[in-house]
């Protein structure tokens, strides 16, 4: 059972991607998130992708702005200044969530939203998000493997 209530709406068709973490050492390559966005857009015709960013994600936001995906009609780049506004937007539209080991992944998982989380420099056995729909991936050499 999700800690913050099961707020997942499987009818939503928006993939949320949070490619930052506040620490470059924890971030999987931005190309991984671009690939996840393209796969979702190609597979789900009426879908959209939101790339979300926090105050510590300026360098990753720059990569997103430079990406050809930023001009795609079904892709939005969003920044959030408060956790409350982020949570409300997430609950309103997220079908699933993809990100690094970060606070936003923990929040999504505790809301019951299916969450794929990538670990690079921290231990997922200690820091894995809690929730019924969490998949953990290790990104330790450019090749991803699921735990």
Predicted regions and their residues:
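Mid-sequence helix-capping/hinge segment at a functional interface
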Residues: 1-26, 30
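A short acidic, often aromatic-flanked loop/helix-cap motif at beta-alpha or helix-coil junctions
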Residues: 4-6, 82-88, 140-147
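Pocket-edge structural micro-motifs
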Residues: 19, 53, 138-139
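Short, charged/polar "capping" segments at the starts of alpha-helices
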Residues: 25-26, 55-63, 124-127, 146
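Donor-binding and catalytic core of enzymes assembling or modifying cell-surface/extracellular glycoconjugates
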Residues: 32-121
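Nucleotide-sugar donor-binding patch of glycosyltransferase catalytic domains
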Residues: 106-147
């Amino acid at each position: 059972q999700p800690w913050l209530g099961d707020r997942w709406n499987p009818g939503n068709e928006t993939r949320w991607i949070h490619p930052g973490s506040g620490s470059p050492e924890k971030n999987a390559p931005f190309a991984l998130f671009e690939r996840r966005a393209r796969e979702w857009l190609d597979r789900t015709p009426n879908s959209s992708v939101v790339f979300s960013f926090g105050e510590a994600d300026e360098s990753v936001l720059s990569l997103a702005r430079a990406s050809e995906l930023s001009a795609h009609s079904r892709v939005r780049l969003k920044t959030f200044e408060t956790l409350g506004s982020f949570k409300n937007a997430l609950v309103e539209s997220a079908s699933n969530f993809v990100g690094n080991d970060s606070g936003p992944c923990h929040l999504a998982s505790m809301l019951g939203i299916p969450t794929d989380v990538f670990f690079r420099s921290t231990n997922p056995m200690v820091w894995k998000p809690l929730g019924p729909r969490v998949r953990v991936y290790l990104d330790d050499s450019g090749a991803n493997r699921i735990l």
